[in-house]
From Swiss-Prot:
InterPro entries: CB, DNA_brk_join_enz, Integrase-like_cat_sf, Integrase_catalytic, Integrase_recombinase_N, Integrase_SAM-like_N, Recomb_XerD, Tyrosine_recombinase_XerC/XerD. GO terms for cellular component: cytoplasm. GO terms for biological process: cell division; chromosome segregation; DNA transposition. It is found in: Cytoplasm. Residues 113-298 form the Tyr recombinase domain. Its main location: cytoplasm. The active site is at R156, K180, H250, R253, H276, Y285 (o-(3'-phospho-dna)-tyrosine intermediate). The gene is xerD. GO terms for molecular function: DNA binding; tyrosine-based site-specific recombinase activity. Residues 1-92 form the Core-binding (CB) domain. Keywords: Cell cycle, Cell division, Chromosome partition, Cytoplasm, DNA integration, DNA recombination, DNA-binding. Forms a cyclic heterotetrameric complex composed of two molecules of XerC and two molecules of XerD. This is Tyrosine recombinase XerD. The lineage of its organism: Bacteria, Bacillati, Actinomycetota, Actinomycetes, Mycobacteriales.
Amino acid sequence: MRVRDLARTWLTHLAVERGLSSNTLSSYRRDIERYCDWLEAARIGDISEIATATVEAYVMDLRRGVDGRAPLSASSAGRALIVVRGLHKFALAEGLVGVDVAADVSPPSTGRHLPDTLSVPEVETLIDAIPTSDIATPVDIRDRALLEVLYGTGARISEAVGLMVDDVTHTPEVLRITGKGSKQRMVPYGSMARAAVDDYLVRARPALSKGRTPVLFLNQRGGPLSRQSAWAALKKAAGRAGIAKDISPHTLRHSFATHLLEGGADVRVVQELLGHSSVTTTQIYTHVTAENLRQVWRSAHPRA
């Protein structure tokens, strides 16, 4: 079977049978199209023509950068390999090949990258940089509510902008967050986030709304707030607050997890709140808190 035809069938399977989100599917499509392009350049068109050495050569080229493409980091090449593995696993399951040639291909080695976080005072400065007084604009009020939700729940930006008004509940006081694979989780949100969301619903959202859209966070035209606009709001707040750290879309999520663990929360509870399918993913934050402890020890202990 032609690899491109197989790729289209597989992506349809992921959308229909697995229920992957449109964002995840778009990412998979980009990775698999890059793989197909590379195979065609190597004059390989049929899935049966691919060997383990072929996949290994592809990963090496991802790291080097070929055909005018920039080299990928080890982590990015590793994610691309995961997609390729998924395609070959599907080919085996469908009986199109007799062996999964990608199963034993190792991802590029990468050093452990500890996620960047903000301290508690930095988070407070970040959020307080957005006006809340009577002169605050509807966008200011919306942005403050958005940041409070991101830090108060650990939601991904894509999850936060995907919230519906009906996802906000007061009895109990939780947000219904829809994560990867359309999996839902109920996450408590604290008094500061609740107050900011309530203020937004009363003072700002009616001014932004141009119709009856059920989406919680709206843009200035009354439509759903995009991930890019939410990210811009976070960067704008960081600029107002004078925070020099390199803020990423996941910074508040990382900070949420780190501060919970530093406060004594069990790692499996944090796993549930973040919506991680495996506790291994969450344990990266235990390394962050351990590193913080080592830094304090080095600066304070007389024999450090």
